[in-house]
């Protein structure tokens, strides 16, 4: 940790982020959210996307500062502009929930889909939820089944409920088609099976 402090003092954003993480989690130091935020902010000022995201999460969760989705979104957008998937998911979630900005389920769907294609499990779960529920999008239960199954494979346990509910809504033929597409996705990745996945009802 001494080496990280030396690098952090010299302005290294990754070292500053690492120290922030130690204080956030209480790893080898006393857990102090305000100190963690200070280090994350320094790293974020240095342009480190992971620090911008973690700072945004602390605002959203109200750790070290008053809970504020609006403030968190400032940092999520900075990290998202650098391509960070986790931050792009959080922006989509804010559109879905109407937290920190006006609710927009269409933009939420687009954000979840984009990051789900990249393999982000939480996005796959939320996309499956929207497709099963018909939440401002056309209900597609077979697609919901596959997306939920993909999320579950990655350990997103909430997706099991969606997968099982979707299975109850599709007949034997659609189930067979969904399982075939799922096997394609597992072997070739989501981008490799996307055309087949999009063709499912």
Residue ranges and their predicted role:
Residues 9-12, 25-27, 32, 45-49, ...:
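Short helix-capping/linker turns of helical repeat alpha-solenoids
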Residues 17, 38, 53, 74, ...:
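TPR/TPR-like alpha-solenoid signature
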Residues 1-22:
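N-terminal segments that cap or nucleate solenoid repeat domains
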Residues 1-2, 30-42, 66-75, 102-111, ...:
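Structural signature of tandem alpha-helical TPR/SEL1-like repeats
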Residues 5-6, 21, 27, 33-34, ...:
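Alpha-helical, heptad-rich or low-complexity scaffold/stalk segments
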């Amino acid at each position: 940790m001494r080496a990280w402090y030396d690098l952090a003092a010299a302005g290294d954003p990754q070292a500053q982020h690492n120290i922030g993480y130690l204080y956030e989690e209480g790893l080898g130091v006393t857990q102090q959210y305000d100190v963690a935020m200070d280090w994350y902010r320094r790293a974020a000022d240095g342009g480190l996307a992971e620090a911008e995201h973690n700072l945004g999460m602390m605002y959203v969760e109200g750790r070290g500062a008053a809970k504020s989705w609006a403030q968190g979104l400032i940092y999520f957008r900075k990290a998202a502009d650098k391509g960070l998937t986790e931050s792009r998911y959080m922006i989509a979630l804010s559109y879905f929930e109407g937290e920190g900005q006006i609710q927009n389920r269409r933009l939420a769907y687009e954000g979840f889909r984009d990051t789900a294609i990249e393999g982000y499990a939480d996005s796959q779960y939320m996309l499956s939820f929207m497709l099963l529920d018909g939440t401002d999008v056309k209900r597609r239960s077979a697609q919901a089944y596959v997306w939920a199954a993909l999320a579950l494979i990655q350990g997103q346990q909430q997706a099991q409920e969606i997968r099982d509910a979707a299975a109850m809504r599709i007949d034997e033929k659609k189930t067979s088609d969904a399982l075939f597409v799922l096997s394609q996705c597992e072997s070739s990745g989501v981008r490799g099976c996307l055309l087949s996945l999009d063709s499912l009802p």
